[in-house]
Amino acid sequence: MPLVLYNTLTRTKDVFEPLVPGHVGMYVCGPTVYDRAHIGNARPVIVFDVLYRLLKTLYPSVRYVRNITDVDDKINARAKESGEPISAITERTTAMFHEDIGALNCLLPDVEPRATAHITQMIAMIERLIAKGFAYAAEGHVLFAVGAMADYGALSRRSSDEMIAGARVEVAPYKKDPGDFVLWKPSSDDLPGWDSPWGRGRPGWHIECSAMSLQHLGETFDIHGGGQDLVFPHHENEIAQSTCANGKPFARFWLHNGWLMVEGEKMSKSLGNFFTVRDLLDQAPGEAIRLAMLTTHYHQPFDWTADGLKQAKATLDRLYTALRGVADIDANGYEGEAPLEVLAALKDDLNTPLAISHLHELAGALNKATGLEDKARRKGALLASGHLLGLLYQDPEAWFKGTGAADGPSDAEIEAAITARAEARKSRNFAEADRIRQDLAARGVVLEDGAGGTTWKRG
């Protein structure tokens, strides 16, 4: 089965074939680093991490580029508000972003360019746009002239009036058309700025990604991804800048993940339902957060709920229980490739819900397996499938023991309680043994008695 992806540009599911056989180039818009990533930021990171893993399985060479936006008015505002230097803000929040997405089992991209390291490339692209008649300088600004591009709006398919409303354009006397957007803007002495032919200034948001993708993937590449909120104006304007400056097609496939809500409502600080990734990591394992987000198809809106997170953790409990039962069996010879049905699900426009349903089936088959080779083969199939989704990398015991609540018992306390319970049972003091079990249960620890002794997990 070929890889099929929903292409926002064509509004259809198209068969994907790399521009250069065997080599895939993918660009995904990364974070603006001024604060901790929220759960809406996490969804595209997880979605495109799964796509990256799939592409690496299917093709010998994949180059994944995800940028860091470290020059932006939001960063400037945060620096003014806090008094902290901009460089300190961007370094600190970039490190926090890496820490948080690492906890979600997301691989690092092959290249992670910073906007501030590509100012020269941005200026060069703007100069080409001016020379070709697609941009003009006015009062220290440089603007893209949307009227000069015949098919501007092809990605979002909006009318000019809709585009002006959707972009919340700034009405300015120096604009030739209300829809013209900023490529370069002047900087006062208290703001970051770079020397340019138009005076000291800084780039607009859209030109940053056009310049960085050109530098690291070339004029035309395979896949450009991001959240649905970026279709317009950001991705529309990237297409305009890149195709007009380079005279060649830009990205061939455009993939966008759907909106994120929280308990059926738009996430908002005013509604009290705004969560950072770190907020959730303080409550639940990153693997459970990741699985919860993959239970809905990436192209659809996703409703984050406490119940959904609980169900994701229960699913991982079942999967790790199956692996715990064969912990002593070596599956190294069988972990190469996920079963065909799992690959088929993901090759059908990243159908992660279907792939997850196959994980349940694989775990069930593993539980019923007999014989060492059968168990090794089925264990390998489950692990390979989980790894393709960024799941099941932990030792089962580590998963069940987890981190626990801040006020919960330590591992040493739990082991001591299990030893005391075993002694109570040995002396037939069953009331004391039951009391210990109930005390641990009340503190979030579940004991499981088996032929090999007592194991435990945090509930």
Curated annotation (Swiss-Prot):
GO term, biological process aspect, one: cysteinyl-tRNA aminoacylation
Binding site for ATP: K269
Signal peptide (residue range): none
Localization terms from the record: Cytoplasm
Tagged with keyword Hydrolase: no
Binding positions for Zn(2+) per the UniProt entry: C29, C209, H234, E238
Catalytic activity: tRNA(Cys) + L-cysteine + ATP = L-cysteinyl-tRNA(Cys) + AMP + diphosphate
Cofactor annotation remark: Binds 1 zinc ion per subunit.
Domain of life: Bacteria
Enzyme Commission code: 6.1.1.16
GO terms assigned for molecular function: ATP binding; cysteine-tRNA ligase activity; zinc ion binding
PANTHER family: CYSTEINE--TRNA LIGASE, CYTOPLASMIC, CYSTEINYL-TRNA SYNTHETASE
Oligomeric form and interacting partners: Monomer.
Stored HAMAP family: Cys_tRNA_synth
Name of this protein: Cysteine--tRNA ligase
Lineage: Bacteria, Pseudomonadati, Pseudomonadota, Alphaproteobacteria, Rhodospirillales
